[in-house]
Amino acid sequence: MSESGPAQVSVSDVVRNKALAAGAERWLDGLPGLIAGLKRDWRIAVGPPFDDATEAYVARARTEDGRAAVLKLMIPRPGDAAQHEIAVLRIAGGEGPDQGIVRMFRYDSDRGAMLLERLGRSLDQLGLPIGSRHEILCATAERIWRPAARSGLPTGAEKGRWLARHITATWAELGRPCSARAVEHALTCAARRVAAHDDARAVLVHGDVHQWNVLEGRDGGYKLIDPDGLLAEAEYDLGIIMREDPVELLTGDPCDRARWLAERCGLDATAIWEWGIVERVSTGLLLTKIGLQPVGAQMLAAADHLAGLDLT
């Protein structure tokens, strides 16, 4: 692989659509110059991008001393996403297989840029049974959960309020692609989780624990990438696992997954279930907006099926 750096920058449709949805046209136009500046300042070679990136421009890179790395350039958007990710990596990152999150070599908050260790295959690429994936997701997420009161990260209550606003606005913008009952259920669950937030119990959570965000570590084990970063109840991360695999969720009793996750991690099943309800609608709408199908439609179909159902 040549990593001398692209004269032209290839951006996937998913990343391009997400950038356009965020109003980041100037960022897209400026990517070649941004990459050239980082190559010079960090003394790195930059190769082709990864095809499966969704939240940022992510490319293969190599340091001056030959170490394999990854260059990640965050899409500019409201909410300080780059600063939050950098904060999580500074708090929870490090060397060795016991670290649950990717190691960060360099960062530039102003440019939304990070130079990260290059990891192996994603959990999705390994083709493991869903039960094995859930065990690995839980075990990896647990290694991140810790007190981080002075991190400056948003709280679970703030995220719950943001999700409610996002659901309301995006549902209307897209012409109501799921039922009003599903949206009402998600908004009710979001309000419950906002009311339940407790600063004293809140821990650092990843915020997007799914099978594409867990990769094989170079020294064994698994590591998370792409943290959103919140100070929230740990159940939030398990709510993401509830959100994922929507087709498989409906093949049995959907409540069983929430109960298993709660028992596995010693947490509250109702909180896990409610975060899953909120995230399923929010993410289904987002994926529909950026054209990532069929999973967007599958999430919304699952949300319609589960509308009004509380954990019993």
Give residue ranges: language-model regions:
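Conserved NTP-binding catalytic cores of kinases and kinase-like/nucleotidyltransferase enzymes
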Residues: M1-I101, G217-G221, A302, L306-T312
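An alpha-helical support segment within catalytic cores of ATP-dependent transferases
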Residues: W27-A36, A149-H206, G217, E263
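A conserved alpha-helical element in kinase catalytic cores
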Residues: P32, D65-L115, L119, L123-I144, ...
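Generic structural marker for isolated residues within well-ordered, non-membrane alpha-helices
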Residues: I35, A141, A258
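Active-site acidic catalytic loop and adjacent metal/ATP-binding pocket
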Residues: F50-D51, E55-T63, V70-L71, M104, ...
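A glycine-centered beta->alpha junction motif in the catalytic cores
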Residues: E64, P76, G94-E95, D110-I130, ...
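Active-site Asp-x-Gly
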Residues: E216-A269, Q293, M299-A302, A307
